[in-house]
């Protein structure tokens, strides 16, 4: 066990789980109800990372450019609600854990690290997704988009973890795939691992200057 780090926080989408197919399906199902065009999966990928309201706002902005159709504030709320409904029904139809995630988490837990999830995903979806892959029991805390007043890139979730478990920021390692993860971690005073395979708006994660850059989740074991 690395004696510097006591707690390891993980982003969810694009870090632990490849959830893009189910997210894209849910976005397009919601858009279809309002006669809006279907977005290709590779485009939806660039909208992920700031929570459901921002995801839908980006989708509607794209749809507006395609069709010229402007939705009312009420309709925007309805699209978001329909997305949440469809995603709730399709959390793990096609989503999969990335390679080596479960095995690595089990090793880290066995080594004595406190493990936590910090995601901007709607809070009500976090535990069900983790449970579907049989890894929810490995985490001592699961923070979603509605768990606290602020979400990433604000450092509040990491401050919360430090306070709850009694650790200094230097004792916390955060692992994510997007610039929001890197910004949040560094703002909190934590070291950060950037993973290259996730959803960083098609921008190389290295450009966000994480402390380590890994291509495979199992590479975490090289520093822990």
Curated annotation (Swiss-Prot):
It holds the Pfam family HAD_2. The active site is at residue 11. Gene3D superfamilies: HAD superfamily/HAD-like, Putative phosphatase, domain 2. One of its GO terms (biological process) is glycolate biosynthetic process. Its cofactor is Mg(2+). GO terms for cellular component: cytosol. SUPFAM superfamilies: HAD-like. Its EC number is 3.1.3.18. One of its GO terms (molecular function) is metal ion binding. Mg(2+) binds at residues 11, 13, 177. InterPro entries: HAD-like_hydrolase_sf, HAD-like_sf, HAD-SF_hydro_IA, HAD_2, HAD_sf, PGP-like_dom2, PGPase_prok. Pathway: Organic acid metabolism; glycolate biosynthesis; glycolate from 2-phosphoglycolate: step 1/1. It catalyses: 2-phosphoglycolate + H2O = glycolate + phosphate. Keywords: Carbohydrate metabolism, Hydrolase, Magnesium, Metal-binding. Specifically catalyzes the dephosphorylation of 2-phosphoglycolate. Is involved in the dissimilation of the intracellular 2-phosphoglycolate formed during the DNA repair of 3'-phosphoglycolate ends, a major class of DNA lesions induced by oxidative stress. Belongs to the HAD-like hydrolase superfamily. CbbY/CbbZ/Gph/YieH family. This is Phosphoglycolate phosphatase. The gene is gph.
């Amino acid at each position: 066990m690395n004696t510097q780090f006591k707690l390891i926080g993980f982003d969810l989408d694009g870090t632990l789980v490849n959830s893009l197919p189910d997210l894209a399906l849910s976005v397009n199902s919601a858009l279809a109800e309002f006669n809006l065009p279907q977005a290709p999966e590779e485009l939806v990928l660039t909208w992920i990372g700031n929570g459901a309201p921002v995801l839908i706002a980006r989708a509607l902005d794209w749809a507006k450019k395609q069709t010229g159709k402007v939705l009312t504030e009420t309709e925007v709320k309805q699209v978001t609600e329909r997305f949440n409904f469809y995603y709730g029904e399709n959390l793990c139809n096609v989503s999969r854990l990335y390679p080596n995630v479960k095995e690595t988490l089990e090793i880290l837990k066995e080594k004595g690290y406190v493990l936590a999830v910090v995601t901007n995903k709607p809070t009500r979806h976090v535990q069900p997704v983790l449970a579907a892959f049989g890894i929810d029991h490995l985490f001592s805390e699961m923070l979603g988009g509605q768990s606290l007043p602020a979400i990433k890139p604000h450092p509040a979730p990491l401050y919360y973890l430090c306070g709850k478990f009694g650790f200094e920021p230097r004792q916390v390692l955060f692992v994510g795939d997007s610039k929001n993860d890197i910004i949040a971690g560094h703002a909190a005073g934590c070291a950060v691992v950037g993973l290259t395979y996730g959803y960083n708006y098609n921008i190389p994660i290295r450009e966000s200057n994480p402390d380590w850059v890994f291509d495979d989740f199992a590479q975490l074991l090289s520093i822990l």
